[in-house]
Amino acid sequence: MAEEIITSTNAETATDHEYNASEIQVLKGLEAVRKRPGMYIGSTGERGLHHLVYEIVDNAIDEALAGYCDHIEVKVLKGDIIQVTDNGRGIPVDIQADTGLPAVTVVYTILHAGGKFGGENSGYKVAGGLHGVGASVVNACSEWLTVNVRRDGREYEQTFRRGDPDGPLKCIGTVDPSVTGTRVTFKPDPEMFKDTTVYNFETLEKRLREESFLNAGVKITLTDERELYTPVLEDGKEGEPTYRTEVMCYEGGIKSFVTYLGEKRDLEVLHPNVIYLKGQTDRGMAEIALQYNSSYNELLLSFANNVNTPDGGTHEEGFRSSLTRVFNDYGRSHGLLKDKDENLSGADVREGLICVISVKLQEAEFEGQTKAKLGNTEIRTLVSNMVYSKLMEFFEENPGVAKAIFEKATQAARARAAAKKARELVRRKSALETSRMPGKLADCREKDPTRTEIFIVEGDSAGGSAKMGRDSAIQAILPLWGKMLNVEKARADRIYGNDKLMPVVLALGCGIGDEFDISKLRYDKVFIMADADVDGSHICTLMLTFFFRYMRPLIEQGHVYVAQPPLFKVQKGSTIKYAYNDAEMALLSQEMPGAKINRYKGLGEMNPEQLWETTMNPDNRVIVRITIEDAEKADEAFTILMGDQVEPRRRFIETNAQYAKLDV
């Protein structure tokens, strides 16, 4: 739709509404959170819903960092009510001087209130919840919240409703003076979380397991009390019905984390023991665990004060730059790199790396309340110096391990050089052609990339139908045929020589890997359109693996979609309807008794008009947008599904069968 610009010829329209001080709103208390919750928890969808739990758990973890807590219990109660209990000191209940309110009331009703602002004089030397908004934001986003505090031999309780106190703090009894801690129970507000208020056990488990790895020796228990389940015992018999529970405690800390990540992917390691580096200054502490494997991919997870930093920051920058320097300096000094050899690149030395970085700082500087990126400049120097000295020392003491890792990096460098030559060859060849576009591409007429879309179609037959049925003004078609390359088992140099993937690279126009530039993307929407069967699903997975490994911003910025062709055509007389799954088919069978039913075995069975109407027409089509909520989880899935190992792939499919679309 063209942009509509409205102008007014009525002078009174522009002056009737006077803009003055009465137009300025001052939001009091927690009104700002309830009015713009996304600013504080990221979204009001599933991600933001789970973020509420993380905020409360982070407060308990801060008690663990301070040395006062070693057990955190998280329960999902019936009705998707959350309860988090820790055995820390308990939130203070005495009167806070500035407000005249009990400290616990202040913490849950006033933004930027907490015990983490005083540096050396605060209740916490290191904390992830540095903004002092976590508890109050959860309160504001809850239909109701109750906090119980045990300290000084007494138990206190206060309840809030949508952020406001539902009565004063009360002492409800006495307890053993040695029993201390805080329990927070809350129900997310359905008025705010309109999409869902249902918690996903696996999502919570993953985050809490991370917390357990990052805090060696701290036990975290997660229990789902929404319904009982019957476990299957080792002998194959059914056990007694119980609540699903995961108990997580790792004495090995982030070393155990790296081992866990590798074992989940069933990767072949280059050295049996995880390399562990640790350094400290008066400004903070850093610890790094790393291990190399035979894969071609890198997995780096970073944390600051136990908060995951998916967008990286200064701690990652310090690690990456120093790691590359260590390899090149060690290689030169030990004759592994000759004078004529180029230096290894960062990508070379990180191929096959699994690494966890954890830093602890007194004054962590995050970008935004969701804390996706660390900004402390001093931590870059700490990490860089520590990695250089400690890793160089490790290599000197373990020359066999150093040599194995170095050989891996030099192989990556040779592949990178081969990829560069292949890339230049492709460019020279393209420059000689009248058009850089692949021959089978049927491009669209529109040149504005924000208005266009491309369908990558399985098979020449379906590609032909798509070309005839499309809206040629805005829709481009690129047919694919033959066996696709599995990039999980190949380096970049093979992509440039691949006649299935290079047409995709050329058509999209934005390059791959280190040269990827999303500003050059030629289409706003990139559709994968394959048959609705096992082969089609496999091709779709191969394409998604390629995009994830070499064009990840395409997915991260929401450009990749999977088209959903119908499975059935249902016709009764002149009435024709389509069913996209078995459930829709069952409903149509009841609605149209005696109808003729055709199951489509492939896209090629549909004529151009049907393909347009069911799968390509923006007004009618069913599509799935591909997103990455969790890069580490996505990495694990692609590694398992597209890797060499059969057994972990079988386990993964069995575990996730309820979420999969199977054709058997």
Identify the meaning behind each predicted range.
Residues 2-22, 30, 54, 62-64, ...:
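GHKL-family ATPase ATP-binding module
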Residues 90-95:
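A short glycine-centered beta->alpha linker in the GHKL/HATPase_c
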Residues 35-54, 125:
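Conserved short strand/loop->alpha-helix "switch" segment adjacent to the catalytic nucleotide/phosphoryl-transfer site
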Residues 414-433, 448-453, 464, 468-470, ...:
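C-terminal interaction appendages of subunits in large macromolecular complexes
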Residues 96-97, 104:
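Short adenine-binding "F-helix/F-box" segment of the Bergerat
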